[in-house]
């Protein structure tokens, strides 16, 4: 009996451990300005995840190349990675960005082409980037997003997210990215009423200019929203990558946001 119980626990533990891990990171101005050393640091930080969603890829020359450099560096870590990059968003010229996804091909399969939101691309300045993946026999679609800055009132565009689950009723949506807005804001209430929950509550994710009294994080901007009826959170966390640097100024050469992640199972 004890052996049976032990085997069951081992199998359950192995099953949970093998579930997909998704990380989201706003990597500030990911483009030609990032050195090979900085790209290598990013790869070392991200290599243990299965899907990477990136915001703030430079729209012009150097952005797509930086993602390719990151994929190349990840491929040196022992697993095979692939990637896809969005077209520039339809925002004003100086606000245009790209999004990117990278994924371990042994863990998940990309289904079809990734695409930028079409219906609300005028209402949302940097319209979100969708990509459908399959893990075992179940599919889910990650919706990668970078909102306008806080002083420009990101809630004025996040409010359109309440229409997306119905618009894509055949998809299991996971919203990730930099919302420049805390999950407690009432703009998220319609999504919550539809069964969506945030992975993080009260977790600050942007870097201060300087640490004060040991506190280095400024605002609760980045998050992940999942449909609680179809997805179960197994584990989650943030990566305090800045602790590897002597100062926040040095750390900010990588990014002014920290990566956020969660591991999940599909019901």
Which residue stretches match the model-derived regions?
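Sec-dependent signal peptide recognition
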Residues: 2-9
């Amino acid at each position: 009996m004890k052996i049976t119980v032990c085997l069951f626990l081992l199998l359950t533990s192995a099953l949970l451990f093998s579930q997909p891990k998704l990380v989201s990171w706003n990597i500030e101005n990911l483009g030609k300005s990032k050195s090979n050393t900085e790209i290598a640091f990013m790869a070392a930080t991200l290599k243990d995840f299965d899907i990477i969603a990136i915001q703030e890829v430079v729209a012009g020359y150097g952005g797509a190349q930086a993602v390719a450099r990151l994929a190349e560096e990840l491929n040196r870590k022992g697993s095979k990675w692939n990637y896809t990059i969005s077209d520039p968003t339809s925002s004003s010229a100086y606000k245009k960005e790209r999004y990117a996804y990278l994924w371990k091909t042994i863990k998940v399969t990309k289904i079809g082409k990734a695409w930028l939101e079409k219906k609300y691309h005028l209402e949302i300045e940097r319209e979100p980037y969708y990509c459908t993946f399959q893990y075992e026999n179940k599919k889910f679609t990650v919706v990668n997003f970078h909102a306008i800055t806080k002083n420009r009132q990101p809630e004025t565009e996040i409010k359109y997210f309440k229409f997306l689950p119905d618009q894509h009723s055949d998809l299991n949506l996971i919203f990730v990215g930099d919302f420049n807005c805390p999950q407690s804001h009432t703009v998220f209430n319609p999504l919550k009423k539809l069964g969506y929950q945030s992975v993080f509550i009260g977790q600050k994710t942007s870097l201060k200019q300087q640490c004060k009294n040991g506190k280095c994080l400024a605002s609760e901007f980045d998050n992940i929203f999942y449909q609680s009826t179809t997805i179960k959170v197994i584990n989650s966390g943030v990566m305090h990558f800045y602790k590897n640097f002597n100062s926040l100024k040095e750390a900010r050469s990588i990014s002014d946001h920290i990566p956020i992640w969660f591991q999940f199972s599909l019901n």
